[in-house]
């Protein structure tokens, strides 16, 4: 049964309450598709009323933006550790392997960013969206800087271009390579099997080809 929380008074209490709600939403993410997770479902999982959720998040989309930041932070931290081991190697194959494997290991991050612009960046205030983008792009800049320390033969603009392509490839490839059951069944037909998308292979190839193209412009 849902319970109505006593209103949090201190900043610490508010932070703890919002984290509890985010944890509930995160648990649901491991069990259900994003489009099936409603604010009512999150409230039930957190054992609170829907009205209580609105005290900490202005909408479902706002809540998922905060989850995206958490997932982005985890992806970034793992990625930075792995990239430090490759500094100044200029090895396109290794950096592609690291970017692909780290993304595959952080499935929640890939799922969330695949619907970020089409779903989560709607029904939220300009203030919430601005704060989100500032934090999100700060995470990406850390990754860009780390990639630049590996691919020292590329300039900053080229590294930004590489990571922009990588990011949007993840956004597009993830849903295409993880179709809904109906599409999966259709792709099992022999005449449609060649439309299957291999996330790992496609992303890795894109990264390597992009690096090669950027290097050719240097020469």
Where on the chain are the PLM-derived regions?
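Amphipathic alpha-helical interaction segments
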Residues: 20, 41, 94-98, 161-168, ...
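Helix-turn-helix
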Residues: 35-62, 66
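Alpha-helical structural segments
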Residues: 16, 20-27, 45, 62-85, ...
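Membrane-interface starts of transmembrane alpha-helices
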Residues: 151, 155-163
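Hydrophobic alpha-helical connector segments
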Residues: 66, 81-109, 162-166
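C-terminal peripheral helix-coil segments that are non-catalytic and often amphipathic
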Residues: 2-5, 138-153, 169-219
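Amphipathic alpha-helical segments used for helix-helix packing
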Residues: 105-127, 181-186
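Basic, helix-initiating cap at the start of DNA-binding domains
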Residues: 1-33, 40-41, 45, 84-87
């Amino acid at each position: 049964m849902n319970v109505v929380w006593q209103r949090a008074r201190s900043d610490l209490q508010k932070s703890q309450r919002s984290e509890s709600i985010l944890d509930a939403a995160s648990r649901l993410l491991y069990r259900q598709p994003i489009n099936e997770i409603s604010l009512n479902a999150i409230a039930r999982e957190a054992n609170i009323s829907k009205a209580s959720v609105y005290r900490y998040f202005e909408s479902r989309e706002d809540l998922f933006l905060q989850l995206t930041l958490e997932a982005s932070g985890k992806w970034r931290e793992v990625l930075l550790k792995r990239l430090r081991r490759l500094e100044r190697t200029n090895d396109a194959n290794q950096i592609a392997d690291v970017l692909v494997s780290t993304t595959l290991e952080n499935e929640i991050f890939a799922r969330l960013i695949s619907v970020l612009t089409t779903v989560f960046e709607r029904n939220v205030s300009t203030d919430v969206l601005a704060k989100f983008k500032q934090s999100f792009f700060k995470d990406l800049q850390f990754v860009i800087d780390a990639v630049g320390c590996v691919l020292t033969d590329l300039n900053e603009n080229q590294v930004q271009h590489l990571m922009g392509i990588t990011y949007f490839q993840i956004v597009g490839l993830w849903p295409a390579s993880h179709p809904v059951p109906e599409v999966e069944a259709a792709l099992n037909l022999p005449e449609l099997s060649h439309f299957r998308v291999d996330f790992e292979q496609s992303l890795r190839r894109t990264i390597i080809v992009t690096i090669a193209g950027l290097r050719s412009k240097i020469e």
